[in-house]
């Protein structure tokens, strides 16, 4: 709730400056980043300091009987910087593995690494949602799809029987978040009713930054933050398109004296709206004919659904 309020305030200030000062840029980027980093830091520290946020692990208990060693597993709730990672055995990764060189302080180092990744995920996802909110219904529909996937993972991870059967990390009490996830999905679908093309209402940065923040924090709470690049692939590609375009433009301007583009326009969804070979100098001109806004949105939704399915599949591939 605290994260939601902070993101709403951040987005509101951005929208307020755009309307009040007639400034399309709104709040300066550095102030947005400061706000996003602050929220990420608070979430990371809360995960570290709260004694109620734990995960359940199976610990080996070997016993020797009649020259045979029998290994039993006892489930114990532990406070560890553990997360879910695809393509590996048991799907679990302890951040302390990267800080073993710190010796007795490896666990503390693991938590520091976890907090750093939390900050990055919160900033990246909230910014990605903000960039995706450029066409009617695009960010809303995409976020609803992501919300459904997170709700399912949350439900499975909060049930000890289902989590054991599906080999998903069991997090005591996380099942309670399903109610919040359902509210989030319901709000998005209700908003989409009026936000679909042609839109009657718009969320602005107040909504898009908050939606991205909710998705990021939710994924972190259920230890699925490393699945974000797959699940939130639409947000990722929108972010990358802007970064690539800006970096390439600055590089070519410095080298050749004039800035050059890779895409006709960024974020990426705007690239498909523009006519190819029609005066816009860019390396990637396809598609030549502009695609209607409604078709771009639906195609991005379809990609989002496939990404959600792939996210679940990765948990079974080891």
State the predicted function of each range.
Residues 18-28:
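Membrane interface segments of multi-pass transport proteins and intramembrane proteases
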Residues 88-120, 126, 297-300:
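Individual transmembrane alpha-helix segments
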Residues 19-21, 51-57, 93-102, 160-163:
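Alpha-helical transmembrane bundle and helix-membrane interface signal
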Residues 7-17:
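Alpha-helical transmembrane segments within multi-pass membrane transporters and channels
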Residues 26-27, 104-110, 168-177:
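Interfacial loop-to-helix junctions that mark the boundaries of transmembrane helices
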Residues 1-9, 36, 41-75, 79-81, ...:
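Alpha-helical transmembrane segments
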Residues 29-33:
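Individual transmembrane alpha-helices with interfacial aromatic-anchor signatures
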């Amino acid at each position: 709730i605290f994260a939601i309020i902070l993101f709403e305030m951040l987005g509101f200030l951005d929208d307020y400056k755009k309307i009040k000062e007639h400034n399309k840029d709104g709040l300066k980027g550095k102030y947005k980043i400061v706000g996003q980093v602050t929220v990420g830091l608070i979430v990371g520290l809360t995960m570290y300091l709260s004694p109620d946020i734990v995960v359940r692990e199976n610990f080996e208990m070997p016993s020797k009987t009649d020259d045979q060693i029998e290994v039993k597993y006892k489930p114990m709730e532990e406070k560890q910087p553990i997360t879910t990672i695809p393509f590996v055995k048991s799907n679990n990764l302890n951040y302390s593995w990267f800080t073993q060189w710190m010796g007795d302080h490896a666990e503390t180092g693991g938590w520091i690494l976890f907090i750093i990744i939390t900050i990055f995920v919160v900033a990246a996802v909230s910014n990605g949602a903000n960039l995706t909110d450029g066409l009617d219904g695009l960010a809303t529909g995409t976020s609803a799809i992501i919300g459904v996937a997170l709700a399912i993972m949350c439900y499975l991870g909060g049930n000890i029987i289902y989590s054991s059967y599906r080999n998903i990390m069991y997090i005591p009490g996380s099942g309670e978040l399903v109610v919040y996830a359902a509210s989030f999905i319901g709000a998005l679908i209700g908003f989409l009713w009026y936000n679909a093309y042609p839109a009657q209402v718009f969320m602005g940065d107040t909504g898009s930054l908050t939606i991205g923040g909710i998705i990021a924090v939710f994924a972190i709470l259920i230890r699925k933050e490393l699945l974000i690049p797959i699940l939130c692939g639409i947000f990722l590609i929108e972010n990358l398109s802007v970064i690539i375009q800006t970096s390439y433009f600055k590089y070519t301007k410095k080298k050749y004296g004039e800035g050059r583009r890779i895409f006709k326009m960024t974020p990426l969804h705007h690239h498909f709206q523009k006519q190819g070979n029609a005066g816009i100098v860019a390396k990637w001109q396809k598609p030549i004919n502009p695609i209607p806004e409604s078709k771009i949105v639906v195609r991005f939704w379809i990609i989002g659904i496939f990404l959600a399915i792939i996210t679940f599949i990765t948990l079974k591939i080891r």
